[in-house]
């Protein structure tokens, strides 16, 4: 997966899809009461990026529905994944609970459109901290309560706090989430990867590859903009790279030394199937 980072309005979405990105990351902001309102990041953000792009969340979902529905004039065949980076900091537990329910409601109303149409997006619901787990609890409860359990086949889950994954696994177990987990590791592009290192990323990949282990389906790294970082991630065996330069990452994947081992994921690929790196 070549995941374009911080895609918060329609112009930048078109630009990244034109570059060939098969997935995007979009930042979702909430009211103090927990209502999902906008695609928006704000300052500070990654280096060399405009931080204030924005669009209403309802409009965003309707637009990506058009882009990901075969037969629609706007359909983009290669567009198959969206990471919803949920901006939950500062919300009370009550607001978090409301937010999870309302995110489910909005996906049903504006993306799945109160019906099981042929939309192709897998949503990765990305929560910043495990202490905000009630958001996922009410999200799951609401989808099941209104009879949309089957659409969970198009949903993955992630905590982005770069914490000890053994503790994260316990949180997933407590939520009754035993599959469809995308684990991630990363840091802003303003800080060189050299200073962060890849030890945690390597740990996640090793855990993913344990035979029979089900709590990590995919591992992605963020936000990688330098060739050395992208090549390192590919060599380690990541499933996705989040980047501010999607065409650059795709170009690296397509180089002869990498194209024999890697290709961009398509809709025919299972977003929850493990592809274990050969020894």
Swiss-Prot record:
Disulfide bonds join 45-51, 47-190. InterPro entries: PLC-like_Pdiesterase_TIM-brl. The keyword Cytoplasm does not apply. It catalyses: an N-(acyl)-sphingosylphosphocholine = an N-(acyl)-sphingosyl-1,3-cyclic phosphate + choline; an N-(acyl)-sphingosylphosphoethanolamine = an N-(acyl)-sphingosyl-1,3-cyclic phosphate + ethanolamine; a 1-acyl-sn-glycero-3-phosphocholine = a 1-acyl-sn-glycero-2,3-cyclic phosphate + choline; a 1-acyl-sn-glycero-3-phosphoethanolamine = a 1-acyl-sn-glycero-2,3-cyclic phosphate + ethanolamine. It comes from the Eukaryota. Binds 1 Mg(2+) ion per subunit. One of its GO terms (molecular function) is toxin activity. Mg(2+) binds at residues 25, 27, 85. SUPFAM superfamilies: PLC-like phosphodiesterases. It is found in: Secreted. Expressed by the venom gland. The keyword Disulfide bond applies. The active site is at 5, 41 (nucleophile). Keywords: Cytolysis, Dermonecrotic toxin, Disulfide bond, Hemolysis, Lipid degradation, Lipid metabolism, Lyase, Magnesium, Metal-binding, Secreted, Toxin. Its cofactor is Mg(2+). GO terms for cellular component: extracellular region. Its EC number is 4.6.1.-. One of its GO terms (biological process) is lipid catabolic process. It is an enzyme of class 4 (lyase). CDD domains: GDPD_like_SMaseD_PLD. Dermonecrotic toxins cleave the phosphodiester linkage between the phosphate and headgroup of certain phospholipids (sphingolipid and lysolipid substrates), forming an alcohol (often choline) and a cyclic phosphate. This toxin acts on sphingomyelin (SM). It may also act on ceramide phosphoethanolamine (CPE), lysophosphatidylcholine (LPC) and lysophosphatidylethanolamine (LPE), but not on lysophosphatidylserine (LPS), and lysophosphatidylglycerol (LPG). It acts by transphosphatidylation, releasing exclusively cyclic phosphate products as second products. Belongs to the arthropod phospholipase D family. Class II subfamily. This is Dermonecrotic toxin LspiSicTox-betaIE3ii. It comes from Loxosceles spinulosa (Recluse spider).
């Amino acid at each position: 997966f070549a995941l374009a980072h911080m895609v918060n309005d329609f112009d930048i979405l078109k630009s990244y899809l034109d570059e060939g990105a098969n997935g995007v990351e979009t930042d979702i902001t909430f009211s103090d009461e927990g209502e999902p309102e906008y695609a928006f990041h704000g300052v500070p953000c990654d280096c060399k990026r405009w931080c204030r792009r924005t669009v209403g969340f309802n409009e965003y979902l309707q637009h990506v529905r058009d882009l990901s529905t075969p037969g629609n004039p706007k359909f983009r065949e290669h567009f198959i994944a969206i990471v919803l980076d949920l901006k939950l900091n500062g919300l009370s537990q009550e607001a978090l609970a409301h937010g999870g329910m309302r995110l489910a409601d909005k996906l049903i109303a504006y993306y799945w459109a109160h019906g099981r149409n042929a939309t192709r997006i897998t949503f990765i619901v990305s929560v910043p901290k495990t202490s905000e787990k009630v958001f996922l609890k009410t999200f799951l409860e609401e989808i099941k309560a209104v009879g949309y359990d089957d659409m969970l086949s198009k949903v993955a889950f992630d905590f982005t706090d770069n914490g000890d994954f053994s503790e994260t696994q316990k949180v997933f177990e407590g939520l009754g989430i035993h599959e469809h987990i995308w684990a991630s590791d990363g840091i802003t592009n303003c800080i060189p990867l050299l200073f962060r290192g890849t030890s945690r990323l390597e740990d996640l990949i090793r855990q993913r590859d344990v035979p029979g282990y089900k709590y990590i389906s995919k591992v992605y790294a963020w936000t990688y903009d330098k060739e050395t970082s992208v090549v390192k991630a590919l060599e380690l065996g990541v499933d996705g790279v989040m980047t501010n330069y999607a065409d650059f990452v795709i170009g690296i994947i397509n180089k002869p030394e990498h194209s024999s081992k890697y290709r961009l994921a398509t809709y025919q690929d299972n977003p929850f199937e493990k592809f274990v790196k050969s020894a």
